[in-house]
Each structure stands twice: as C-alpha cells, then as structure tokens.
Amino acid sequence: NIKESLRLFVLGLGTVALCVCYPASSWGQKPPPPANPQAPTINPVIPTGVQRGQAADFVLTGTNLASPTGVSIGCAAKVTIPSEEKNGTDPTKCKVRIETPADTPIGWYTFRFATIKGVSNLRVFCVDDLPQVVADGKNRSASTAQALPAPCTISGAVAAEQGDYYKITVKAGQRMSFDCQARRIGSAIDAYLKIYDGKGIRELAYDNDSPGCQTDPRITYTFKQAGDYIIEVRDVLLRGGPEFFYRVRIGDFP
C-alpha cells in the first residue's frame, strides 16, 4: 500500500545517506574488534595486489589466523594455502598463494580471510597488468633509493618521519606517469609524490592531492634528459606504520 511504500522509501533514503556520508576520517584506520572475538583479523596485505596471469605468494599477518578454510577475493582466482612447514597453525601469520587468470579485469577487489572460527575484516586487493615489486625497507633516503624497472607497480608502507625513495632510469624525452593509490585502497596515509634529479637534490615535480583521486597524488612528467631520477613517497604529516601503505603504478599510461 501507499503508506508502506513511503516507509520503505524513507528507509532507503537513510541507507543512501549513510553510504554517502561515510566519514573520510575513518579511512585507513585499524579494523574494529570483530563481533565474534574468535574471528580472524588481517593486517594490510603487502604486496597490495598481483599481476594478472601470474601467481604470487603472500604472508598474511594478524590474529586468529590458525585453521584457515579459504580466501575470498571478489574475482576469479586460484587460491592455495600451502601445508608445508606447519602453515595454517600459527595464529599470527599464514602463507597463501594467489593466481588470477590473464583476462581478469584490472581493478580493486574485496579481500577476506576465513578460518573455522569466522571471517576476517575486509582489505582491498588489486589486480594489475604491471609487474609487482615490493619495497625492500632499505630505501629510506635518496642515497639508498631502491632501483625499479619501468613499467611496474611498487608496494610499500612508510615509516614515521621518513619517506620511501626509488630510482628509475629513463630515456631523453620519455613520458612517465606515477599514480599513487593509497586512500583509494583503504590506507591511512595522506601521501605526496616528488620527482628529483638523480642525486635527489633538485625537485622537478610534486603532487599531493590530484583531482578525482581522493587526496592521492598523481604525476605525469616528460623527462628532458636521459639518466637516473629519484621518486619519493611520504606522508604529508610525517606519519607512518603498517596502516600507512601505498602502491605506485609507474609507466607510460594516461
């Protein structure tokens, strides 16, 4: 009847309002304790994704991870939980192998880990067409910048009061894009990107909040001279930790 229809319409508006008004301040925060205290919780997944058509191993960390039953990714994927070395018995970590078909659409997918006791909090998992590289943890200064192939996607997490530095080698006139995905994939970091000369001294380009990227930075730059260049990723407030993770796609794309 009309009265019931109006009631459902008002409830629908309330649901939409809750979705639209979800506070940005909650992005990247640690997941709240699960309603089921025996359910698993997972920390940020590093690397933050996989190259489609390739298999990759991930060591998940968190709580209550023993006795796993599976992983839900939100896309077609082959997930294996190896049984060697007593994998699956440690409540704080678990190794999984993930392989996605070569025709998997590039994008962001939901990621959850399940055990016999429940299902974990949600993380974002990325499927990409670029090779995946993980930060080596030794790249906290321009002089120790981690060399990267191009194109690639680099995954890492910044430490407090420190940036992560990477080195790329380009040809004269080469155009490159640097797309930092952070807030868009649930990170706490308010990232900025900088491009320096090969010594890490002269700043060539900078971005903090790129339009349409939910405060994530993005730079497209044409290098006039061939050689090495330094890329820096840092939180604008110098914060850091496991929840301040990021991924930067590097290549000649729009």
Q: Can you name each region flagged by the protein language model?
A:
Residues K95-T104:
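Extracellular/luminal low-complexity segments enriched in Ser/Thr/Pro
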Residues N1-L6:
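N-terminal secretory signal peptides that target proteins for export/translocation
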Residues N36-S83, T89-P91, A102, I116, ...:
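Acidic, Ser/Thr/Pro-rich low-complexity intrinsically disordered segments
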Residues Y22, S26-P40:
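Cleaved targeting-peptide boundary
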Residues R123-A150, F253-P254:
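Predominantly extracellular/luminal regions of secreted and cell-surface proteins
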Residues T104-T115:
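A short beta-strand micro-motif common to beta-rich folds, especially ectodomain repeats
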Residues G107, V119-R123, P242-F244:
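Extracellular and select intracellular beta-sandwich modules with Ser/Thr-enriched
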Residues F9-P23:
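Bacterial N-terminal signal peptides
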